[in-house]
Amino acid sequence: MAEIELKNISKSFASTEVIKSLDLSISNGEFITIVGPSGCGKSTLLRIIAGLENQSTGDVEIDGNVVNNTRASERDLAMVFQSYALYPHLTVQQNLMVPLKLRRLSFLERFPIIGWFMPNRRSKLDEVVSKVQAASETLQITHLLERKPGQLSGGQQQRVAVGRAMVREPVAFLMDEPLSNLDAGLRVHMRAEISELHRDLKTTFIYVTHDQAEALTMSDRMAVMMDGEILQLDTPHEIYNNPSTIRVAEFVGSPKINILKGEYDEKGNLKCFGIKITDSIKLAKKGNVSVGIRPEHMELVSSNEKKIFKGEIVYRENLGSDIFLHLTVNEGEQKIIVRSEPSNVINTAVGDQVWIRWDEQKIMVFDVDGNNMTTKYI
């Protein structure tokens, strides 16, 4: 296991700054995910940790040692890429043995014919085979050892790529969008497998993805990164329920959080479209605000209830277990999404006028600068 710390890391390509004075501490054995949209600098940051890219300023520390000038091959980190990079002419077993042979055997011991006569070669090879066997049993790919990559499915290739990193027994695993090439169903399955592998190995995992579902389901902590900066670093639960800014709130969650124009008046009432929705939220400043509410925290109700507003259904999105109703509110000026169980909206149709209520305890309020006014981030 390894503790990894990034101090004041920045990276520029010519005049373009892609990482801006970034600090990040990763604990021993932690599974941390760096999540953000394409182009935010997350893969560049991972390459800096790996030693494949040099930072412009700042320090990378592994277990308290500055490794700025340490070659990638000497940092004892294992990387799994989006492209599995398996040798197509080698069997699975041979693919798994390659990194161990390079590390355990000397140049002469790897040399054809001459190496066969080196005195320690056999014992070293036996150790390599033993480690490959152990890794293949952990990943449940023992029955695939004699196959070549072209005979494997995408999920099987992904497991072999992880196994090739695993046999090295690195101090940390670096994973750069390893599930991006898989279909949706297999991706869900592999998320569970990688999480289970982390629990078994108890090794530090740094995982980069643009897929928020991967970040939310697998991480001990997740770092939301945009425009070269980490906007929030916290547990998945906290980031989903207490986003520090409106940008984080809109990025995390599917469907996206509903953001409505609101006002906090002199009497301490929070209003949307001129309708009082709550007086239980106390804010430091009066004036215009943005009100956030997630689709699952809204519901359709009868028109005789209080603190509700009217909308028109413009689209029904049926996902089987859930139905997402796309509505226009405030005379069509804004759109929102309401998540509901199918049995609750079975009689609704596009064009219907409906009444909506939301859970007051789940309301988020953001100021004009996009900062969350209703959480610990005040």
Predicted ranges, named:
Residues 35-37:
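The feature captures the beta-strand-to-loop junction immediately N-terminal to the Walker
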Residues 56-59, 227:
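Conserved coupling/switch loops of ABC nucleotide-binding domains, chiefly the family-specific signature
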Residues 4, 19-21:
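Conserved structural motif at the start of ABC-family nucleotide-binding domains
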Residues 58-66:
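Conserved ABC transporter NBD signature motif
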Residues 50:
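Helix-to-loop junction immediately C-terminal to a conserved catalytic motif
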Residues 91-247:
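ABC ATPase nucleotide-binding domains
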Residues 267-378:
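Non-catalytic connector elements of ABC transporters
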